[in-house]
Curated annotation (Swiss-Prot):
Gene name for this UniProt entry: rpsS
PROSITE patterns for this protein: RIBOSOMAL_S19
GO biological process: ribosomal small subunit assembly; translation
Protein name: Small ribosomal subunit protein uS19
Function of the protein: Protein S19 forms a complex with S13 that binds strongly to the 16S ribosomal RNA.
Regions annotated as coiled coil: none
PANTHER family xref list: RIBOSOMAL PROTEIN S19P FAMILY MEMBER, SMALL RIBOSOMAL SUBUNIT PROTEIN US19M
One Gene Ontology term, aspect cellular component: cytoplasm
Record keywords: Ribonucleoprotein, Ribosomal protein, RNA-binding, rRNA-binding
Length: 92
């Protein structure tokens, strides 16, 4: 279900503080975050966030198309190794 409009987008408070500090300093360091559930806001465009996927921080460079999505969508938590091939086809 979609979040109701009157509530507004959810963003972790500490994330807003980190983003504002990064904008004020003018530095383009990776901002480490653990809040995968936070919504990407327009003020985050141009910043790079390190989104934690359970093992490491995956760098996510925010652009305009990402606004409105969640940070967790851009940091996969599971590794797909592929399906095994058909062994009978290799012998033929």
């Amino acid at each position: 279900m979609v979040r109701s409009v009157w509530k507004g987008p959810f963003v972790e408070g500490s994330l807003l503080k980190k983003a504002d500090a990064a904008r004020a300093s003018g530095r383009h360091d990776v901002i480490k975050i653990w809040s995968r559930r936070s919504t990407i806001l327009p003020q985050f465009v141009g910043l790079t966030f390190g989104v934690y996927n359970g093992q490491k921080h995956v760098p996510v460079a925010v652009n305009e198309e990402m606004v409105g999505h969640k940070f967790g969508e851009f940091s996969p938590t599971r590794t797909f190794h592929g399906h095994s091939g058909d062994k009978k086809a290799k012998k033929a």
